[in-house]
Amino acid sequence: GNSPESLAAVNVARTVCKNIKFLNLTCAPEGKLAVESANDSNALTVLIPRANDKGFAMTGSYTCMELLSTLIFDEASDEQKAAWVEAAAVMGENVVAREEEVAAFLSGDYTRVTYLGSGSFGGLAQEAQLKILELAHGLTATSYDTSMGYRHGPKSFVDDKTLVFVFVNNDPYTRQYDLDILHEIGGDEIAMKTIAVQQ
């Protein structure tokens, strides 16, 4: 709601485009983005509940805005969208219920984290690595890439203190690349752990 990038993007768009409309998704009703567009007939601000983020990473806010964007812009039926929300809620409850198990599995003296995601998971991989970088205050080195791109140089980032997460795509063709890089990194026996994240 107050990021210089968001506000600058709106100002540049207003300058460059003669006929433009804005859809603002924010959880900050007092933010400049919401306030400055309140009386603008070419702007619609959709406020979402605050996610009670306590840190700089804003993981809850990001998750809510990502979900809302999908619900707004995807052409699926309302019934299908409701099913997605229900499935996401169930997955979230399962993760919370298994928090101790997950924490124990991921415990260790790691200093590097890599996220790999292809296709629709490319942006998620980038955001995930950014969140780790922010939450660890830069003390954990992070990287992200696609499954195909990673093997062509960036894989040299992996050492024996690296956790590698691969978001495994549901698309059958893309999934082959994701599973292949999982097996390749696991077979190298260098990374501390290689973890598949999938449904």
Residue ranges and their predicted role:
Residues 1-84, 167-198:
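Glycine-rich phosphate-binding loops that contact phosphosugars or nucleotide phosphates
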Residues 38-165:
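Active-site phosphate/pyrophosphate-binding segments
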